[in-house]
């Protein structure tokens, strides 16, 4: 993972890019104090960085691409345009629910297990480099397609209220929950989803 000085540069850029002076919580950000004293929004231990920035009046684009120390980013309920966390191989959790984003790049996030990105304006989402993803929550977007073929570890999938016309559920023996209501699905084969305990596929075009 990148060292503390490099992490500090990433955070200073994040602060500038998203209007840090207008954040609700910004204690000691961009000061010379140790990262451990940058308020409760920053946790940096043993070379691993977690950020808690939900409902903090962030505006603009979050660009943490290449921040190899990042393991968790929670930034729900802000006013953002785009989030780029590509090339963050340790990132395990991203919550950007209800941020208004139209772009999200998680390429190279090989450790990602939990992705919550519902209530945004996403029209595409690339998940080919997220093989360990177990929870995908992406309802209320504008997705016309959703390729989860690389995400064989999925247990919980919520893709409700999008524009999906097909959803390939082949080989999903481990899937426990599926919410896909409010799409344009005409066919949905769940015959191989032997672990499913909760399903809602209403308001589609299924026959």
PLM region spans:
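Conserved hydrophobic beta-strand positions in leucine-rich repeat
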Residues: 49-53, 71-75, 92-96, 113-117, ...
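N-terminal capping/linker segments that flank leucine-rich repeat
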Residues: 1-63, 68-71, 89, 110, ...
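Consensus "Asn ladder" position of solenoid repeat domains
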Residues: 56, 78, 99, 120, ...
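Canonical leucine-rich repeat
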Residues: 61-62, 83, 104, 125, ...
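Residue-level signal for secondary-structure boundary elements
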Residues: 22-26, 100, 142
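Short, intrinsically disordered, charge-balanced linker/junction segments flanking boundaries
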Residues: 201-207
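Residues on the solvent-exposed faces and adjacent turns
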Residues: 77, 87, 98, 108, ...
């Amino acid at each position: 993972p990148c060292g503390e000085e490099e992490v500090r540069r990433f955070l200073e850029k994040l602060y500038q890019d998203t209007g840090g002076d207008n954040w609700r919580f910004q204690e000691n950000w961009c000061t010379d104090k140790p990262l451990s004293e940058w308020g409760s929004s920053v946790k940096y231990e043993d070379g691993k960085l977690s950020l808690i920035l939900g409902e903090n009046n962030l505006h603009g684009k979050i660009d943490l691409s290449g921040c190899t120390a990042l393991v968790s980013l929670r930034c729900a309920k802000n006013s953002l345009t785009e989030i780029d966390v590509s090339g963050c191989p340790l990132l395990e959790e991203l919550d950007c629910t209800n941020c208004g984003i139209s772009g999200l790049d998680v390429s190279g996030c090989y450790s990602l297990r939990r992705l919550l990105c519902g209530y945004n304006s996403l029209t595409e989402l690339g998940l080919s480099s997220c093989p360990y993803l177990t929870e995908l929550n992406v309802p209320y977007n504008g997705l016309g397609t959703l390729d989860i073929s690389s995400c064989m570890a999925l247990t919980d999938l919520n893709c409700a209220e999008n524009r999906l016309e097909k959803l390939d559920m082949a080989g999903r023996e481990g899937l426990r929950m599926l919410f896909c209501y409010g799409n344009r699905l005409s066919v949905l084969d769940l015959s191989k989803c032997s672990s499913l305990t909760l399903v809602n596929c209403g308001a589609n075009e299924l026959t």
